[in-house]
Regions:
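Sec/Tat signal peptide C-region and signal peptidase I cleavage site
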Residues: 18-23
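Positively charged n-region of N-terminal signal peptides that target proteins for export
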Residues: 1-7
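Bacterial N-terminal signal peptides
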Residues: 7-17
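Tandem repeat scaffolds
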Residues: 24-219
């Protein structure tokens, strides 16, 4: 009789949804890695380092503060997704669709976004050092206060983009479309501009900062 009551209780718990956490976790893993489709999934703070997520559908998903270092997201659909504060260092995002995605404060240094779709995406205050954005579409994107030093933006579309106070030191902008882009306050030091010429006029700011930091360290 006791065994009967125990198993009846277990069945009741299962039907009441107590085990939904385990079931839902298995579900998103199946959708993400097997079906390659996890639209509007909540993956906030998930550890997906070095995950093979090429061509996966993740549109409108939540990936805030997710660990995606060195993940393969080539050709992935991340349109409208939220990746605020996400770690994407060294990730492969070649040809990925990030249209309208929110990447504010994300860490993308060393990531490959060649030919990626980033129209009207929010990349403000993100770390984009040494990022490959060759031929990427950044039309209307918000790149305010980003660190784009040593990045490759050759042939990229930056029409109407916000680059206010962006650090473009040693960046490559050869052949890029910067029409109607806001570059006020941007650092252009050893920067290759669309014409192919090297711009040095903004070097005074990083030099002053370097001098200031040196003095602080010497104290």
């Amino acid at each position: 009789m006791n065994h009967f009551v125990f198993f009846s209780f277990l069945i009741l718990l299962m039907h009441s949804g107590i085990f939904i956490t385990h079931a839902s976790e298995t579900d998103w893993e199946n959708r993400l890695f097997i079906k390659k489709e996890c639209i509007k999934c909540n993956l906030n703070k998930h550890d997906l380092r070095k995950a093979q997520l090429n061509n996966v559908m993740l549109s409108e998903s939540l990936l805030n503060q997710a660990e995606l270092q060195e993940a393969n997201l080539q050709g992935a659909d991340l349109s409208g997704a939220s990746l605020r504060g996400a770690h994407l260092e060294g990730a492969n995002l070649r040809g990925a669709n990030l249209r309208g995605a929110d990447l504010e404060g994300a860490y993308l240094n060393g990531a490959d976004l060649t030919m990626a779709e980033l129209e009207v995406a929010n990349l403000s205050s993100s770390d984009l050092r040494a990022v490959k954005l060759l031929g990427a579409n950044l039309q209307g994107a918000d790149l305010g206060n980003t660190n784009l030093s040593v990045s490759d933006l050759a042939l990229s579309i930056l029409k109407g983009a916000n680059l206010k106070n962006a650090n473009l030191q040693s960046a490559n902008l050869r052949g890029a479309d910067l029409s109607k882009a806001d570059l006020s306050g941007a650092i252009l030091c050893n920067t290759q501009v669309p014409s192919g010429e090297i711009e040095y006029r903004g070097c005074i700011i990083p030099l002053l900062l370097e001098s200031f930091n040196t003095k602080i360290q010497d104290q």
